[in-house]
Amino acid sequence: MEYHNVSSVLGNVSSVLRPDARLSAESRLLGWNVPPDELRHIPEHWLIYPEPPESMNYLLGTLYIFFTVISMIGNGLVMWVFSAAKSLRTPSNILVINLAFCDFMMMIKTPIFIYNSFHQGYALGHLGCQIFGVIGSYTGIAAGATNAFIAYDRYNVITRPMEGKMTHGKAIAMIIFIYLYATPWVVACYTESWGRFVPEGYLTSCTFDYLTDNFDTRLFVACIFFFSFVCPTTMITYYYSQIVGHVFSHEKALRDQAKKMNVDSLRSNVDKSKEAAEIRIAKAAITICFLFFASWTPYGVMSLIGAFGDKTLLTPGATMIPACTCKMVACIDPFVYAISHPRYRMELQKRCPWLAISEKAPESAAAISTSTTQEQQQTTAA
């Protein structure tokens, strides 16, 4: 594969970095307002591009304000309701709470982006970039691993309901593993022992370095792409494909048996209600995992292009799109649960009646038993 040397794109790098070249009245280059001691933290790739219009930075800053408000309200509600409602404090839902926590914390760093955007660039400097990178890496990698464990849990609940039950101890162990799994990547970049956090695009956001043209950077990008994206995505795809296969084969077996017995269905009302709820929860989890895949794939592709492909494809404007998709999914996740998780909807309805959520309580075994007893008594009396 042919690698593009950044210096060949820049021509004479020193001329690009000259103050008079960067402060031209006609066209300012990115980084023109960055102190000289901070320029060394910025990949040279970005410094050849003109500064974007002020309106573009204002637009992105405003968009991120919207993302932050929606995500923090939505994920805050998920964490509150799932933690406060006794019926939702199940081992499986510990993973749901952790996913909401990751999405919530992902938006904690957006004030750095917003401040930089309204100040037209790398305003908070290297320190702000490090904070942005640390939080973003922890929450992004942890969200992917959490989605993988949610898929594993749904697989066990639906395909092995008796022996595959989650326990609180197992759920806590999974959470600990998730953050231990993310820690080496974060520490390596923060200490710059392998990789580093650098600004990207309009120099208003930061991520791991995928542009420096050397073996260490390419190896780091390949490894983090595999362990933080390919591995979770593979697990998610496998477990949900197994769920779909199990549901279809189970339904077919029930229909065949019912036909042999000349009955409409072999399920009791309780079984139907319980399975319907489980399927709805699985659908919600599948949707969220699809959103994870759709939102992080552009970022993964972009980093691979930066490390192994044609860097000229990565313009500042183009690289801001994957950054936005990652934040967008943090806004959508809680509303997927609001739509698809029946018990969450019920508890949210109790605590926030002004939301006008209409969710009926599932038919319980006790209610069905009482109804059956009454019918039997009426039949006997007759």
Curated annotation (Swiss-Prot):
- Keywords associated with the record: Chromophore, Disulfide bond, G-protein coupled receptor, Glycoprotein, Membrane, Phosphoprotein, Photoreceptor protein, Receptor, Retinal protein, Sensory transduction, Transducer, Transmembrane, Transmembrane helix, Vision
Q: Describe PTMs of this protein.
A: Phosphorylated on some or all of the serine and threonine residues present in the C-terminal region.
Q: Where in the cell is it found?
A: Membrane
**Glycosylation: residue positions:** N12
Q: Which GO terms describe its cellular component?
A: membrane
Other information: Each Drosophila eye is composed of 800 facets or ommatidia. Each ommatidium contains 8 photoreceptor cells (R1-R8), the R1 to R6 cells are outer cells, while R7 and R8 are inner cells. Opsin Rh3 is sensitive to UV light.
Q: Mind telling me what this protein is named?
A: Opsin Rh3
